[in-house]
């Protein structure tokens, strides 16, 4: 039987065109319902046959009475009307407490955390309701433009929480509460909740095209606000917001309006323009990294860096081994290399920190100037 031994946790959807029953049905359905970390909480079954009766019968055969109730309530999707009512309740609660999404980032820290917790819980149900074909993303309760504004604020607050928690962990500092009240810790939600709701580069390119077709400053500002919101819905793109802003400005300077119209014909041409722009920035940033370490007395070999970055481009990620990073250093030309056993004031090995710093510098370089332009 094909299903025997077939196990792929990443499998998302199973299309069924057979009258499955009993253990075969359970075995088939379980293949796509395997959870996969934070990226996959459930699978989807699309059946071209009416096998509801077979499904109910199979559950009765292989689940105890208590488990059967849990399976039916948690495994089988509810009717759209029921799910959509819950979605409407969520939007009412969010809008009542936070009527203006543009003002959320101006709130006090704990108020922002409260919003982050509320919206993060809502995203789980949002992901569910948007999986139904009946769901209209431009519904009157929370249309996509408004949702993106809330999600942009949520994304930024989540990033602030991550940084604060990382700093506390690094410093091993426990924050004292002077009021003697126990303050609720903010939650960190998985970015995958935003899967399918984050803006991609093609959408941003579409907005950039609109930008240069604006006839007045007021319309131009509206499009710029849309671009800003779109960027902030996707953490991968948000970290490169400065590059995109420079790119938009550079386009206006580099092309006359007639030539711009040729560029606008396809988003593919815009992506090529961004690649060219990032290539120039990449070269200057790479030289800056090398120069920054040279100032510290560490000589890095440029052609080795190029080779490792090209390998990373083919793999889609920058993940050199420890020895690969060490190969970047030309020891004979370096004037201030620590020994393998030398430690700093905190007792950390200086050589280990140097290798980590070099690796992090080139990893950040790769993410910003090479991998970034491939984001879809």
Curated annotation (Swiss-Prot):
Any single GO BP term: DNA restriction-modification system
Recorded GO MF terms: type I site-specific deoxyribonuclease activity
Pfam family name, one: T1R_D3-like
Gene3D superfamilies given in the database record: 1.20.58.910, P-loop containing nucleotide triphosphate hydrolases (3.40.50.300)
Membrane-spanning residues: none
Keywords, in A-Z order: Restriction system
Biological role: The N-terminal section of a putative type I restriction enzyme that if reconstituted might recognize 5'-GAN(7)TAY-3' and cleave a random distance away. Subunit R is required for both nuclease and ATPase activities, but not for modification.
Protein name: Putative type I restriction enzyme MpnIIP endonuclease subunit N-terminal part
Source organism per UniProt: Mycoplasma pneumoniae (strain ATCC 29342 / M129 / Subtype 1)
């Amino acid at each position: 039987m094909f299903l025997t031994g077939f196990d792929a946790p990443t499998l998302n959807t199973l299309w069924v065109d057979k009258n499955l029953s009993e253990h075969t049905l359970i075995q088939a359905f379980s293949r796509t319902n395997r959870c996969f970390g934070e990226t996959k909480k459930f699978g989807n079954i699309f059946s071209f046959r009416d096998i509801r009766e077979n499904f109910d019968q199979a559950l009765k055969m292989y689940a105890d009475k208590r488990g059967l109730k849990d399976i039916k309530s948690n495994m089988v999707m509810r009717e759209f009307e029921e799910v959509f009512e819950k979605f409407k309740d969520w939007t009412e609660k969010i809008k009542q407490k936070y009527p203006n999404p543009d003002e959320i980032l101006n709130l006090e820290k704990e108020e922002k955390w409260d919003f982050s917790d509320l919206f993060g819980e809502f995203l789980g149900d949002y992901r569910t309701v948007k999986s139904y074909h009946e769901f209209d993303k431009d519904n009157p309760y929370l249309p996509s433009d408004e949702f993106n504004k809330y999600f942009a604020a949520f994304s930024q607050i989540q990033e602030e929480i991550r940084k604060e928690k990382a700093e506390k962990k690094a410093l091993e500092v426990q924050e004292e509460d002077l009021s003697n009240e126990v303050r609720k810790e903010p939650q960190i939600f998985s970015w995958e909740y935003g899967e399918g709701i984050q803006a991609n580069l093609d959408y941003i390119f579409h907005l950039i095209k609109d930008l240069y077709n604006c006839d007045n400053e007021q319309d131009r500002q509206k499009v710029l606000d849309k671009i800003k919101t779109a960027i902030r819905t996707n953490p991968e793109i948000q970290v490169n917001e400065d590059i995109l802003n420079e790119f938009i400005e550079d386009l206006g300077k580099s092309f006359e309006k007639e030539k711009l119209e040729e560029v606008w014909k396809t988003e593919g041409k815009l992506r090529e323009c961004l690649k060219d722009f990032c290539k120039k920035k990449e070269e200057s940033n790479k030289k800056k990294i090398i120069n920054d370490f040279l100032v510290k007395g560490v000589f890095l070999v440029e052609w080795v860096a190029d080779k490792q970055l090209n390998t990373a481009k083919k793999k889609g990620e920058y993940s050199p081994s420890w020895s690969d990073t060490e190969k970047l250093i030309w020891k004979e030309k370096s004037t201030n290399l620590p020994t393998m056993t030398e430690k700093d004031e905190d007792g950390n090995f200086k050589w280990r920190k140097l290798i980590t710093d070099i690796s992090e510098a080139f990893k950040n370089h790769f993410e910003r100037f090479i991998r970034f332009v491939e984001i879809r």
